[in-house]
């Protein structure tokens, strides 16, 4: 007695084999075509992967090129900054030395012109004589001092043209018969200037 299960399996295999044979007889190259299609698909996948890889490499190369350019520009800026900083430091040192030299020369020039005045004052104090002799010595010293100021281009501030707040300092306002208002009535302390620069304002009284 034949088992129905085995019979059914054999029947299925027979039918499947017959179908395969018919398919092959109708399309004898079907296996080759399937294989070619598979290879084409794989080839396409490889081409796609290669194109993507190529694009990534080009992008990476471009990025590296830009990075290198930026690095070079940064180094150039650093070098320029260092040069400017060094030049400024050298300029500052030269300027400081020049200022110091000018100040030293100016002090030396003033002292050279003032020391003879001190010498004459010391001589006047050392001489035994009358008050008149002392007065003459002081007058001579004053003239010498005025000459020294003139050599330094320092001049006395004038009060002849009336009160000027830029040049004079009013200590008091007074009434003075026969005088116009805003005139200098008396000078308490002389003022001096060098060019347009006021060294010391004149201390004065001013008329109403």
From Swiss-Prot:
Subunit structure: Homodimer.
Domain of life: Bacteria
UniProt name for this protein: Protein GrpE
Signal peptide: none
Family: Belongs to the GrpE family.
Biological role stated in the UniProt entry: Participates actively in the response to hyperosmotic and heat shock by preventing the aggregation of stress-denatured proteins, in association with DnaK and GrpE. It is the nucleotide exchange factor for DnaK and may function as a thermosensor. Unfolded proteins bind initially to DnaJ; upon interaction with the DnaJ-bound protein, DnaK hydrolyzes its bound ATP, resulting in the formation of a stable complex. GrpE releases ADP from DnaK; ATP binding to DnaK triggers the release of the substrate protein, thus completing the reaction cycle.
Major localisation: cytoplasm
Sequence segments annotated as region (Disordered): 1-38
Subcellular location(s) of the protein: Cytoplasm
Gene Ontology BP terms: protein folding
Cellular component terms per the entry's GO annotation: cytoplasm
Keywords linked to the UniProt accession: Chaperone, Cytoplasm, Stress response
UniProt entry tagged with the keyword Chaperone: yes
Source species taxonomy: Bacteria, Bacillati, Bacillota, Clostridia, Eubacteriales
Species of the source: Clostridium perfringens (strain SM101 / Type A)
Biased composition (Acidic residues): 29-38
Stored PANTHER family: GRPE PROTEIN, GRPE PROTEIN HOMOLOG, MITOCHONDRIAL
InterPro entries referenced in this protein's UniProt entry, alphabetically: GrpE (IPR000740), GrpE_coiled_coil (IPR013805), GrpE_head (IPR009012)
Gene Ontology MF term list: adenyl-nucleotide exchange factor activity; protein homodimerization activity; protein-folding chaperone binding; unfolded protein binding
Composition skew (Basic and acidic residues), residue ranges: 1-25
SUPFAM superfamilies found in the cross-reference section: Coiled-coil domain of nucleotide exchange factor GrpE, Head domain of nucleotide exchange factor GrpE
Keyword DNA-binding: no
């Amino acid at each position: 007695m034949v088992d129905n299960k085995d019979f059914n399996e054999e029947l299925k295999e027979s039918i499947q084999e017959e179908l395969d044979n018919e398919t092959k007889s109708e399309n004898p190259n079907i296996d080759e075509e399937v294989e070619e299609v598979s290879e084409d698909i794989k080839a396409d996948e490889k081409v796609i992967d290669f194109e993507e890889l190529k694009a990534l490499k080009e992008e990476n190369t471009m990025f590296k090129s830009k990075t290198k350019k930026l690095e070079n520009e940064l180094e150039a800026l650093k070098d320029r900054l260092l040069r400017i900083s060094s030049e400024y430091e050298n300029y500052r040192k030269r300027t400081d030395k020049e200022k110091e030299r000018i100040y030293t020369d100016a002090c030396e020039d003033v002292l050279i012109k003032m020391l003879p005045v001190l010498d004459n004052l010391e001589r006047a104090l050392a001489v035994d004589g009358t008050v008149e002799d002392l007065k003459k010595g002081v007058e001579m010293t004053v003239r010498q001092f005025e000459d020294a100021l003139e050599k330094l281009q320092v001049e006395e501030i004038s009060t002849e043209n009336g009160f000027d707040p830029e040049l004079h300092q009013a200590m008091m306002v007074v009434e003075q018969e026969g005088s116009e208002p805003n005139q200098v009535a008396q000078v308490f302390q002389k003022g001096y200037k060098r060019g347009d620069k006021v060294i010391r304002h004149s201390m004065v009284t001013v008329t109403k």
